[in-house]
């Protein structure tokens, strides 16, 4: 007789797409078997590890975590351990050979099959592996979306077809596949009806979105944004992550036509050196990247930009790195996600000679991050005295008499106000800037009929 599984614990590594996928894993298990999430592994009957293979250290973390969970399984033989995400897709059966305590291995495109895979593992008392790429099937089998707060991610596409020389995503998530236009709008409308005020359209290469409409025509991201903006209750729209070569003039024009599209853009550049960009197979030059930002800034002078940077790519010389620093100065980035190059097996870059010493890579990364932190602090200081629209999303961690929310450029703002403002927009005067947040004073708040109650 199979043990009834009641509780699940999930640990997530990596990008926002993985966070989105983890929320869907929890939803399918709850809908199919009534399995509910718990706060610690010790309480769980199912342990899930949603993995990332973008960097080597993230992959090493997977097997370290599985080693820690092995002792739990020895004490609770009925415990089911599952590994999902990009490491699962990349390694498949090898995960079970290296960690035989794992019962289920599933990829990003097969998470909707998780309940059946767990049942199969229980019946067979052996491992089950499903890392196939069934195209858009995943989205057709997911439960109805549920709002857990005033902001929500909506996945509009999967995979990537760019094949940058350093990246494993095309191999682990497959080629680009866009969700049908009406399906995306329906999910956004459902979330809006539940109190979601801000939608973040999500994809590995989101501005390559090409979704089929009901009449057979194809919609791009620019058109999708316009339609999402027309959904009642939606007050803000973001999208991530974009590729510069797909950033069309039509998408740039949405910053003029759609006020609900926030004045902040994350657009990964990776390097400020044309030579390194060519080695990365990024398909654009620095001047083209800057031209796109200039067009957007001409429409939205107050817009802020963030980016991704890879430091120490094979063959990077000091002048290449200096070109990156020059680009940072020219753009004045608000935030960065910056890392030392990590060799990924099977990618073209893994065969390139890497003569940059690790000490040099670390020193360059420290310089880059320090400069962008200075820029971020400068932008925060410049916001003092300004009035900002803040989407209130929770009580402040410091006081129950204060609430916390985010500005369009993702600054956390704490200010005195009642909890009934959660889920509403508030105009706040910024009174002080700190390292990780801003302080403000409430000027006015959006009027809504009733406070929103979110289900978590």
Swiss-Prot record:
Gene3D superfamilies to which the protein is assigned, alphabetical: Methylthiotransferase, N-terminal domain, tm_1862 like domain
GO molecular function, one term: 4 iron, 4 sulfur cluster binding
Residue positions binding [4Fe-4S] cluster 1: 15, 52, 86
EC number: 2.8.4.3
Radical SAM core domain location: 146-380
Binding site for [4Fe-4S] cluster 2: 160, 164, 167
InterPro entries xref list: Elp3/MiaA/NifB-like_rSAM, Methylthiotransferase, Methylthiotransferase_CS, Methylthiotransferase_N, Methylthiotransferase_N_sf, MiaB_methiolase, rSAM, rSAM_horseshoe
Domain TRAM: start-end pairs: 381-444
Main localization category: cytoplasm
Keywords from the UniProt entry: 4Fe-4S, Cytoplasm, Iron, Iron-sulfur, Metal-binding, S-adenosyl-L-methionine, Transferase, tRNA processing
Catalytic activity as recorded in UniProt: N(6)-dimethylallyladenosine(37) in tRNA + (sulfur carrier)-SH + AH2 + 2 S-adenosyl-L-methionine = 2-methylsulfanyl-N(6)-dimethylallyladenosine(37) in tRNA + (sulfur carrier)-H + 5'-deoxyadenosine + L-methionine + A + S-adenosyl-L-homocysteine + 2 H(+)
Cofactor(s) it depends on: [4Fe-4S] cluster
Localisation: Cytoplasm
Record text on cofactor binding: Binds 2 [4Fe-4S] clusters. One cluster is coordinated with 3 cysteines and an exchangeable S-adenosyl-L-methionine.
Taxonomy, superkingdom: Bacteria
Function: Catalyzes the methylthiolation of N6-(dimethylallyl)adenosine (i(6)A), leading to the formation of 2-methylthio-N6-(dimethylallyl)adenosine (ms(2)i(6)A) at position 37 in tRNAs that read codons beginning with uridine.
UniProt similarity note: Belongs to the methylthiotransferase family. MiaB subfamily.
HAMAP family from the UniProt entry: tRNA_metthiotr_MiaB (MF_01864)
Subunit organization: Monomer.
Record protein name field: tRNA-2-methylthio-N(6)-dimethylallyladenosine synthase
Organism encoding this protein: Dichelobacter nodosus (strain VCS1703A)
Gene name, Swiss-Prot/TrEMBL: miaB
């Amino acid at each position: 007789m199979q043990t009834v599984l009641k509780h699940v614990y999930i640990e997530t590594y990596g990008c926002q797409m993985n966070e989105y996928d983890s929320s869907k894993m929890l939803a399918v298990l709850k809908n199919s078997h009534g399995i509910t999430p718990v706060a610690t592994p010790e309480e769980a009957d199912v342990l899930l590890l949603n993995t990332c293979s973008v960097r080597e250290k993230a992959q090493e973390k997977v097997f370290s975590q599985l080693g820690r969970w092995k002792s739990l399984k020895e004490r609770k033989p009925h415990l089911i351990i599952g590994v999902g995400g990009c490491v699962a897709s990349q390694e498949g059966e090898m995960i079970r050979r290296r960690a035989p305590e794992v019962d289920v291995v599933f990829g990003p495109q097969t998470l909707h099959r998780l309940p059946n895979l767990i049942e199969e593992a229980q019946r067979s008392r052996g491992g089950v592996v499903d890392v196939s790429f069934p195209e858009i099937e995943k989205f057709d089998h997911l439960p109805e979306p549920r709002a857990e707060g005033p902001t929500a991610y909506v996945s509009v596409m999967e995979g990537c077809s760019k094949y940058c020389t350093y990246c494993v995503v095309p191999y682990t998530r497959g080629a680009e596949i866009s969700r049908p236009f009406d399906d995306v709008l329906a999910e956004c409308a459902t979330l809006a009806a539940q109190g979601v005020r801000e939608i973040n359209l999500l994809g590995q290469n989101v501005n390559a979105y090409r979704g089929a409409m009901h009449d057979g025509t194809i919609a791009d991201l620019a058109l999708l944004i316009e339609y999402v903006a027309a959904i009642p209750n939606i007050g803000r729209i973001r999208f991530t992550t974009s590729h510069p070569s797909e950033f069309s003039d039509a998408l740039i024009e949405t910053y003029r036509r759609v006020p609900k599209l926030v004045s902040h853009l994350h657009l990964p550049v990776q390097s400020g050196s044309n030579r390194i960009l060519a080695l990365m197979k990024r398909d654009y030059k620095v001047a083209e990247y800057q031209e796109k930002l200039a067009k957007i800034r001409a429409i939205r002078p107050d817009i802020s930009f963030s980016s991704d940077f890879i430091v120490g790519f094979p063959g990077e010389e000091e002048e290449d790195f200096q070109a990156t620093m020059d680009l940072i100065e020219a753009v004045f980035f608000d935030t960065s996600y910056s890392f030392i190059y990590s060799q990924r097996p099977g990618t073209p870059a893994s065969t390139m000679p890497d003569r940059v010493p690790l000490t040099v890579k670390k020193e360059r990364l420290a310089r880059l991050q320090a400069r962008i932190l200075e820029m971020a602090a400068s932008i925060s200081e410049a916001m003092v005295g300004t009035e900002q629209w803040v989407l209130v999303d929770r009580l402040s961690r410091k006081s129950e008499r204060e609430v916390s929310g985010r500005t369009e450029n993702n600054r956390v703002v704490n200010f005195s106000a009642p909890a009934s403002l959660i889920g509403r927009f508030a105009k706040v005067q910024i009174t002080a800037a700190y390292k990780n947040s801003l302080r403000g004073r409430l000027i006015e708040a959006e009027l809504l009929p009733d406070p929103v109650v979110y289900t978590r």
